[in-house]
């Protein structure tokens, strides 16, 4: 007897799908994701650095049980300064981004969460602490479930409603993650990097919508890791948008731009965000949805796109 996996999805290549027709005939569903993250200062007994994925702002990251003030405060710049610069850009543009948040950030940086709530922007749980990856619990499903439950409880307490979408910190989920999220009533799982369109993930608790993320179109990979200049970054974003927009005439596409306030919120980089938002807004037939909106819409239309097998 073959064990049933906790979650799975079929391989359906793009040519084998039906056309995806977004609301209003939109060619591109454009998601701006602001990742609002909080790292623990130190964790007793942990020898691995607390900043998984890096890079460090200075080399030679310290063990996780030693406070690394240089790297911790670099990220804190985003909470103290960068996020407010980013918010101002979106306010002026009249675009509502999707904001992910660690549960610990909601507790330690309530001022930021309140500012997002005041604007009516989407809030998406992003694990408890940014450095406490779900993959640390890959062989401890009960431990992973407890972390997710703790995060969702904090989310509901702070936001005032149950969560509907989830992005794991460092996009490090496990095979069990989609099933746990479906069990807790969520409709969207956003960790996977394998598509430009939504699709259904089957779980032992029922289907959940994958709203894909992108690690290529992401300020951390573009600037902190890739060392692009601000102008090169704008050019890259425009090229990506133009390609997806052209393809979207036949079947709709998602473009997700991942943002981190300590990266894009730097004074020499904020122009890249401002210029690209203006560029995307100038195009017709562009949808600026929340992740929840995409998931709910797709649940009603998935059979036209990828028929059940």
Residue spans for each PLM region:
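A conserved mid-domain beta-alpha-beta active-site/ligand-binding segment of alpha/beta enzyme cores
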Residues: 212-245
């Amino acid at each position: 007897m073959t064990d049933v996996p906790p979650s799975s999805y079929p391989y359906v290549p793009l040519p084998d799908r039906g056309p995806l027709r977004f609301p209003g005939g939109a060619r591109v569903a454009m998601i701006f994701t602001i990742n609002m993250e909080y790292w623990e200062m130190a964790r007793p007994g942990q020898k691995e650095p607390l900043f998984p994925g890096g890079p460090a702002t200075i080399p030679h990251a310290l063990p996780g049980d030693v406070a690394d003030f240089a790297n911790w405060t670099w990220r804190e710049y985003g909470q103290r300064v960068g996020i407010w610069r980013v918010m101002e850009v979106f306010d002026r543009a009249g675009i509502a981004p999707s904001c992910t948040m660690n549960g610990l950030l909601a507790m330690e940086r309530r001022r930021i969460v309140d500012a997002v709530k005041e604007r009516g922007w989407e809030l998406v749980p992003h694990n408890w602490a940014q450095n406490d990856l779900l993959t640390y619990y890959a062989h401890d499903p009960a431990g992973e479930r407890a972390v997710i439950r703790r995060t969702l409880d904090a989310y509901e307490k702070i936001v005032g409603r149950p969560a509907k979408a989830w992005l794991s910190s460092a996009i490090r989920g496990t095979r069990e993650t989609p099933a746990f999220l479906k069990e807790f009533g969520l409709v969207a799982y956003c960790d996977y990097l394998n598509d430009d369109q939504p699709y259904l993930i089957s779980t032992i608790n029922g289907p959940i919508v994958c709203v894909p993320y992108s690690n290529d179109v992401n300020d951390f990979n573009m600037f902190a890791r890739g060392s692009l200049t601000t102008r090169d970054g704008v050019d890259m974003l425009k090229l990506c948008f133009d390609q997806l927009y052209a393809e979207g005439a036949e079947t709709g596409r998602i473009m997700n731009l991942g943002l981190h306030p300590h990266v894009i919120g730097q004074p020499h980089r904020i122009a890249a965000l401002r210029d690209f938002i203006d560029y995307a807004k100038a195009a017709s037939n562009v949808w600026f949805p929340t992740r929840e909106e995409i998931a709910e819409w797709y649940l009603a239309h998935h059979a036209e796109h990828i028929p059940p097998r």
